[in-house]
From Swiss-Prot:
UniProt KW keywords: Ribonucleoprotein, Ribosomal protein
UniProt xrefs under InterPro entries: Ribo_uL30_ferredoxin-like_sf, Ribosomal_uL30_bac-type, Ribosomal_uL30_ferredoxin-like
Record's protein name: Large ribosomal subunit protein uL30
Family: Belongs to the universal ribosomal protein uL30 family.
SUPFAM superfamilies: Ribosomal protein L30p/L7e
Molecular function GO labels: structural constituent of ribosome
Quaternary structure annotation from Swiss-Prot or TrEMBL: Part of the 50S ribosomal subunit.
HAMAP family for this protein: Ribosomal_uL30_B
Ranges annotated as spanning the membrane: none
Gene: rpmD
């Protein structure tokens, strides 16, 4: 059975955000505006997405 995945896209700039939030976005594998990363759907990843929910969008 395949692992469940979640795609996230960076939709807001990191300028003016907290350093810890920038590090979280980098941890999600996102670099530039509108970049997309596909990650395993784990509680840790969900928590990271929740922390920076105002910067990212979950796709599909």
């Amino acid at each position: 059975m395949s692992e469940k995945t979640v795609k996230v896209q960076l939709v807001k700039s990191l300028i003016g955000t907290r350093e810890s939030h920038r590090a979280t976005v980098r941890g999600l594998g996102l670099r530039r505006l509108n970049s997309v990363s596909e990650l395993q759907d784990t509680p840790a990843v969900r928590g990271m997405i929740n922390k920076v929910s105002y910067l990212v969008k979950v796709i599909g």
